[in-house]
């Protein structure tokens, strides 16, 4: 079991999500639409300055895990990629062309390690509140909490281990978003919602 690199140095990572063009989700069953995607960072002030912690063998925090990009940009790019991959257009501000407005409040984007006797457990959590509003019926909103998690066992824990754990949790978050029946229902035309 090795935690490679100096545990006293911050780890800089670049988490991301890439949509698989050969794999679509239930979002593809919807009529193509223009979606305004708004991302807000609701994390605590302690968690806003980093996206995780490196822990030593005693469980104490030895360094921070820092993202090379703002968390709001990571979420915007991930959800945009998934919506685009399923035939929808994403814009950053509501307009007359907008069918739905999706507001995402990021509550958690976090990774850390736990040293065990024979291995290192890498954990990550991605959690956000999703609100979908219909332009034609602004009073009609859907609010849902979506979470993605990852727990991976490793023998070595370098910077890439933290990034891989967050990428796995982010992928799970996007999959949950794209397959959630309440979210799909909120995207449907009000006349056809069931």
Q: How would you label these PLM feature ranges?
A:
Residues 56-70, 136-183:
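Short secondary-structure boundary motifs at beta->alpha junctions and helix caps
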Residues 39-41, 106-110, 146-148:
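A mature extracytoplasmic/lumenal domain signature
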Residues 73-85:
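Amphipathic alpha-helical segments
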Residues 7-20, 86, 90-141, 151-153:
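Surface-exposed short loop/turn segments
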Residues 74, 97-99, 168:
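Short, well-structured alpha-helical interface segments that form or flank functional binding sites
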Residues 4-73, 182-194:
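A structural "domain/chain start" motif
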């Amino acid at each position: 079991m090795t935690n490679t690199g100096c545990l006293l140095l911050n780890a800089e990572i670049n988490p991301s999500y890439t949509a698989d063009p050969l794999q679509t989700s239930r979002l593809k069953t919807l009529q193509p639409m223009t979606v305004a995607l708004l991302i807000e960072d609701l994390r605590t002030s302690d968690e806003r300055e980093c996206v995780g912690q490196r822990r030593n063998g005693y469980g104490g925090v030895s360094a921070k895990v820092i993202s090379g990009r703002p968390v709001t940009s990571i979420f915007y790019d991930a959800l945009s990629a998934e919506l685009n991959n399923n035939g929808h257009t994403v814009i950053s501000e509501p307009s007359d062309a907008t069918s739905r407005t999706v507001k995402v409040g990021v509550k958690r984007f976090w990774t850390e390690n736990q040293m065990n006797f024979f291995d290192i457990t890498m954990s990550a959590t991605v959690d956000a509140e999703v609100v979908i509003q219909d332009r034609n019926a602004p009073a009609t909103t859907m609010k849902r909490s979506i979470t993605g998690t990852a727990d991976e066992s490793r023998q070595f824990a370098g910077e890439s281990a933290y990034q891989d754990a967050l990428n796995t949790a982010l992928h799970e978050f996007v999959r949950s978003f794209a397959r959630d029946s309440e979210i799909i229902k909120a995207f449907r035309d009000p006349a056809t919602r069931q």
